Regions:
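Conserved PLP-binding active-site segment of the aspartate aminotransferase-like
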Residues: 5, 294-298, 315-345
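Conserved N-terminal alpha-helix of the aminotransferase class I/II PLP-enzyme fold
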Residues: 30-81, 100, 108
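PLP-dependent aminotransferase-like
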Residues: 76-141
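Conserved PLP-binding catalytic core of the aspartate aminotransferase-like
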Residues: 279-309
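Active-site C-terminal subdomain of aminotransferase-like
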Residues: 190-269
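Active-site phosphate-binding strand-loop segment of PLP-dependent enzymes
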Residues: 109, 120-173
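Single conserved hydrophobic/aromatic residue that forms the stacking wall/gate
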Residues: 352-363
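N-terminal "arm"/small-domain region of PLP-dependent enzymes with the aminotransferase-like
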Residues: 1-39
Length: 363
């Protein structure tokens, strides 16, 4: 049975990336060494990391005055990292909270530096973008562009009237284009759209580099100066990230993945909305995530049945987050149209079967 993996992360990888990774584990670039053995200060790895940085500049259209970093610790580490940088003693950090991960961030930030919390429900995001709330005194504004647990996405951050945004893009980076004009710093764990766990992509404006007296792995200036090699980096995760960026460029870059994201998410949302008698989509239209579609059945028993039968059909990763329940469909960059076809057919058959129990549930 073919598996269709819609996991929220670690997420599906394109088969070509898995195949190339397997080859590199056996023998990297005909060196006789496994990629797992390559020294992080070797010429081979230097070539790899430089090529990766060029790929990221290409994909994200990164300006020349921005740095790129590859760090460990995931997006959660970034809560501590950000709080200890960006002039923590003198600058107020504002936090736009639209869901669970943004709330976790502000809880961590507030233990380290002065923080202003701005709570915005999914129903208020559109109004907030059009008429920003009180940002008086806020020197940096942090937000999470896509809340994987809540199914809320804020893509129009370039319209926010603030010139120093800090953005957690862990679950939607690479799925739509954006401008850098008002972005101070962007970060993303790789394991959803860009690879596997272990490495985080960090991109920032060089004018925010500081000389704060932080310990080494909290010292933004030192990390940039050492080009992500202050200590031993997650070499294999970086290698897979390089493969993903190669693949993204070959597929057509950001424009390709943005078009695909719009097409696939629109199809599933429209389908679910046609079954309003059975399911609830708890997010307002403007804020609906293209990356993580959240919905619940009105009947809890039918929801359990839907998940069990999906697994039997080879459709995996649909369970909502343990804190929310429900269903979560994750449509990251690696999800193919064929996978969405299969899922869509299952949704139709499953929900028709609810109203016509004698009808066979076969795809």
């Amino acid at each position: 049975m073919q598996i269709h993996n819609f996991s929220p992360g670690p997420a599906r990888l394109d088969p070509s990336i898995i195949s190339k990774s397997q080859e590199a584990i056996a023998n990297y670039q005909k060196t006789g060494l496994s990629i797992l053995e390559i020294g992080h200060r070797s010429k081979d790895f230097e070539t790899l990391i430089n090529a990766l940085q060029e790929n990221m500049i290409n994909i994200f259209n990164i300006p020349s005055n921005y740095f790129t970093l590859l760090l460990q610790g995931g997006a959660t580490y970034q809560n501590t990292f950000i709080a200890n940088n960006f002039d923590k003693e003198n600058k107020l950090l504002g936090c736009l909270v639209t869901g669970t991960w943004g709330r976790y961030s502000v809880e961590d930030f507030s233990k380290i530096r002065d923080t202003k919390i701005i709570e915005v429900s999914d129903n208020e995001i559109e109004n907030y973008i059009q008429t920003p709330w009180d940002l008086e005194g806020v020197d940096y504004l942090h937000l999470t562009s896509n809340e994987t647990i809540n199914g809320v996405q804020l893509r129009e951050f370039n319209k926010i009237e603030h010139d120093s945004l800090l953005i957690d893009m862990s679950s939607d980076i690479g799925s739509y284009s954006f401008e850098w004009d008002n972005l101070a710093y962007v970060y993303a764990g790789a394991q959803k759209n860009m690879g596997i766990p272990g490495v985080s992509i960090c991109i920032g404006d060089e004018k925010y580099l500081n000389s704060e007296d932080n310990s080494r792995y909290l010292n933004l200036g030192q990390l940039v100066e050492k080009n992500s090699l202050l200590n031993t980096p997650p070499t294999f995760s970086i290698y897979v990230l390089k493969l993903v960026t190669d693949w993204m460029i070959a597929m057509g870059g950001i424009n390709h993945f943005e078009e695909k994201s719009i097409r696939q998410s629109s199809r599933i949302y429209e389908q679910l909305e046609s079954y309003g008698d059975f399911v609830i989509i708890p997010v307002s239209d403007y804020s609906k995530s293209r990356s993580n579609i959240i919905f619940k059945f009105k009947n809890e028993d039918l929801e359990k049945k839907f998940l069990i039968e999906a697994t039997e059909k080879g459709i995996l990763g649909l369970n909502g987050h343990r804190s929310q329940g429900g269903i979560r469909i994750s449509l990251y960059n690696s999800i193919t149209d064929e996978m969405v076809d299969y899922l869509s057919e299952y949704i139709d058959l499953s929900l028709i079967h609810i109203s016509e129990p004698t009808r066979p549930l076969e795809i």
